[in-house]
Amino acid sequence: MARARKGALVQCDPSIKALILQIDAKMSDIVLEELDDTHLLVNPSKVEFVKHELNRLLSKNIYNPMDEEENQ
């Protein structure tokens, strides 16, 4: 029997999917279903939170050469 779930379909590359799953591991109510390598079904009320957390995580990993110049 098929089951229906309300969710937001997220399409992303595998590296972003891994980050979303990492966020979900801490909260455990974000990802409803892993569909394949590039698609997730996400709780619609958590989409903005996921975007915010992804931006925060990705901004920590950005190299900015201006930061080095300021520290010297």
Curated annotation (Swiss-Prot):
It is found in: Nucleus. Coiled coil: none annotated. SMART domains: Tbf5. GO terms for biological process: nucleotide-excision repair; nucleotide-excision repair, preincision complex assembly; transcription by RNA polymerase II; transcription initiation at RNA polymerase II promoter. SUPFAM superfamilies: TFB5-like. InterPro entries: TFB5-like_sf, TFIIH_TTDA/Tfb5. Keywords: DNA damage, DNA repair, Nucleus, Transcription, Transcription regulation. PANTHER family: GENERAL TRANSCRIPTION FACTOR IIH SUBUNIT 5 (PTHR28580:SF1). Component of the general transcription and DNA repair factor IIH (TFIIH) core complex, which is involved in general and transcription-coupled nucleotide excision repair (NER) of damaged DNA and, when complexed to TFIIK, in RNA transcription by RNA polymerase II. In NER, TFIIH acts by opening DNA around the lesion to allow the excision of the damaged oligonucleotide and its replacement by a new DNA fragment. In transcription, TFIIH has an essential role in transcription initiation. This is General transcription and DNA repair factor IIH subunit TFB5.
